[in-house]
């Protein structure tokens, strides 16, 4: 199910060990530290390979995440806001990543711009609790979704390039 390129990307993202969500206040801080370390490593790896494609930050509690992601198509950079909340049942439940400005523009999206990850990503996440975290959700969830959906939306004329 996972191709060699994805397998290589995954092998370079540190696996997490602490099983804690926002409700476990004391242990959540430790889990959050692991999350940040994995995200930093993933972003560093992306930059080194020339495939830098997102920036994320969180609120102080680490429960709300937001930032930008972008997709290059025909040498044009399409940029989108990205956001998600950490579910109270995290890490058992994966975060639902949203691209609000694309809400309603594709069938592979739920209300509020939440991308559809049900078929491929959620079973993989469930098999890897608590080892997978936010960096893994970006690599296995949002990245492949962007790679499939954005070119299709561009070709259909549903989204167009915006000059900065």
From Swiss-Prot:
One Gene Ontology molecular-function label: UFM1 transferase activity
Keywords: Ubl conjugation pathway
Pfam family of the protein (one): UFC1
GO biological process: protein ufmylation; response to endoplasmic reticulum stress; reticulophagy
Nuclease recorded as keyword: no
Gene3D superfamilies: Ubiquitin Conjugating Enzyme
Organism domain of life: Eukaryota
Signal peptide span: none
Mutant lacking the gene: phenotype: RNAi-mediated knockdown shows aberrant neuromuscular junctions in the larval muscle, and abnormal wings together with locomotive defects in the adult.
Active site residues per record: 116
Protein function: E2-like enzyme which forms an intermediate with UFM1 via a thioester linkage. As part of Ufm1 cascade, might play a role in the development of the neuromuscular junctions.
PANTHER family on file: UBIQUITIN-FOLD MODIFIER-CONJUGATING ENZYME 1 (PTHR12921:SF0)
Family to which this protein belongs: Belongs to the ubiquitin-conjugating enzyme family. UFC1 subfamily.
Subunit relationships: Interacts with Uba5 (via C-terminus). Interacts with Ufl1.
Protein name: Ubiquitin-fold modifier-conjugating enzyme 1
């Amino acid at each position: 199910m996972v191709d060699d390129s994805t397998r290589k990307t995954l092998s370079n993202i540190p696996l997490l060990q602490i099983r804690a969500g926002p409700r476990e206040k004391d242990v959540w801080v430790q889990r959050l530290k692991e999350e940040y370390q994995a995200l930093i490593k993933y972003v560093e790896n992306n930059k080194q390979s020339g495939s830098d494609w997102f920036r994320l930050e969180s609120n102080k509690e680490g429960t709300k995440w937001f930032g930008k992601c972008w997709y290059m198509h025909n040498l044009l950079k399409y940029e989108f806001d990205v956001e998600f909340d950490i579910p109270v049942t995290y890490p058992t439940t994966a975060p639902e990543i949203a691209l609000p400005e694309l809400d309603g523009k594709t069938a592979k999206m739920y209300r509020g711009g939440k991308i559809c990850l049900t078929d491929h990503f959620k079973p993989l996440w469930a098999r890897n609790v608590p080892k997978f975290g936010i960096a893994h959700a970006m690599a296995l969830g949002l990245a492949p979704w962007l790679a499939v959906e954005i070119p299709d939306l561009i070709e259909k004329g549903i989204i167009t390039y915006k000059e900065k």
